[in-house]
């Protein structure tokens, strides 16, 4: 499903983002990628979505070699990925329904299908009664649920979450983590980047730890992982 083979990435300023990284993630796995600031977590995500390319090595996503993909095929790659960010990135002037529907409108889905898919995903994330609300009327946890709904409305094969609980209180963070578990249980591969060790222990999933652009640990259960 996802594979990094000896991936090396250096930015123009000379900083090494990833150094000889090899990772294999099976279809349907839930994997946490952890590390301090500058460890290489953000670059890892950017490589998955072809936002950046490696200087050497191979990146496979959904059985596609994204290091060799044609630029015309990148939008099709990204349609199979759902991405959730720490800062939600909702459109403030659009309702909850419209924010989620936007992800389908850009791929020219039919209005009837859009309505059905959006209502279904709103029920999944527990926001059926918030469809007509604006983001400013929602709590932080509710805004993140909208962002998650938008990311999964097109049924991606892989859901990528970049510090999704970073702006949330502990209980809301656990609620959001439970939602990611439910999405994973439905068959979606989940890759979550986080530095929140409480969430790592709570989720109790496979943990890949990065430090200085290298994989320093790859453990099958988060409860056994402790940040130095």
Listing of model-derived features with the role each one plays in the protein:
Residues 49:
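Helix-to-loop junction immediately C-terminal to a conserved catalytic motif
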Residues 57-65:
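Conserved ABC transporter NBD signature motif
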């Amino acid at each position: 499903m996802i594979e990094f083979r000896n991936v090396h990435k250096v930015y123009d300023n000379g900083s090494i983002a990833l150094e000889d990284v090899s990772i294999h993630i099976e279809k349907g796995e839930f994997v946490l990628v952890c590390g301090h600031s500058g460890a290489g977590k953000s670059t890892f995500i950017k490589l998955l979505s072809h936002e950046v390319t490696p200087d050497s090595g191979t990146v496979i996503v959904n059985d596609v070699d994204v290091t060799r993909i044609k630029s015309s095929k990148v939008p099709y790659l990204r349609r199979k990925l759902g991405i959730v960010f720490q800062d939600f990135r909702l459109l403030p002037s659009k309702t909850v329904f419209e924010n989620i529907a936007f992800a389908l409108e850009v791929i020219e889905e039919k209005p009837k299908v859009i309505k059905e898919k959006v209502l279904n995903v709103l029920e999944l994330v527990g926001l059926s009664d918030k469809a007509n609300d604006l983001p400013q009327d929602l709590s932080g946890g509710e805004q993140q649920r909208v962002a998650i709904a938008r990311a999964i409305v097109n049924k991606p094969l892989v859901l990528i979450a970049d510090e999704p609980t970073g702006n949330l209180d502990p209980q809301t963070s656990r609620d959001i983590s439970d939602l990611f578990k439910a999405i994973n249980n439905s068959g979606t591969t989940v890759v979550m980047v986080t530095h929140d060790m409480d969430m790592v222990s709570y989720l109790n999933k496979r943990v890949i730890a990065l430090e200085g652009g290298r994989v320093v640990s790859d453990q099958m259960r988060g409860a056994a992982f402790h940040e130095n």
